[in-house]
């Protein structure tokens, strides 16, 4: 009986820990979002106002305008991964 209880405990404890990890991971999921570039003219002069954003290409951009400019120049689908530095 004690051996059976021990085996059940060894089986359940790792599962409980895994559930907690999944909940923490799910709570911190980051989904990319599209930058608002439609209003921009061809190759605009971007303001130098620092408002750092992290692109899905892994690069940090000074602001959304700079990310849009890179999208236009490279024709790549770079999105905003998160606000702030990568």
UniProtKB/Swiss-Prot annotation:
Gene3D superfamilies for this protein: 3.30.60.30
Disulfide bonds: 37-68, 46-65, 54-86
Protein name: Serine protease inhibitor Kazal-type 4
Localization annotation: Secreted
Residue numbers marked as site, Reactive bond: 48-49
GO CC annotations on file: extracellular region
InterPro entries associated with the record: Kazal_dom, Kazal_dom_sf, Spink4-like
Main location: secreted
Domain of life: Eukaryota
GO molecular function, one term: serine-type endopeptidase inhibitor activity
Tissue specificity remark: Expressed in the intestinal tract.
A Pfam family recorded for this sequence: Kazal_1
Keywords: Disulfide bond, Protease inhibitor, Secreted, Serine protease inhibitor, Signal
BP GO annotations: response to xenobiotic stimulus
Organism name: Mus musculus (Mouse)
Domain Kazal-like: 31-86
Signal peptide: 1-26
